[in-house]
Amino acid sequence: MNRIIIDTREDFEFNESHVDGAINISPSVFATGKIPPELASTPKDTEIIVYCRSGQRSNTVGQILRMHGFTNIVNGINEQHVTKRLNEAV
């Protein structure tokens, strides 16, 4: 299954720990109003799981992605929730 996992925390938080395979794109990148290069060629129906520490930043990023036409956004809340979700999917 094709999916993208985005950790929306700051670089230092991502560097401490993150979900395997996640890419780090902070909300400030999305605040420019443009889609980051990492997502430029991503099909709009690709599953995109976003997470942060508490779900607030990931919720904001999810809303921005929806405004850009992405249709399969999952707010994974935090690293632990995403890890659990991925383990259950196996």
Task: Please give the residue ranges for each predicted region.
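Rhodanese-like catalytic fold shared by cysteine-dependent sulfurtransferases
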Residues: 2-4, 8-49, 53-90
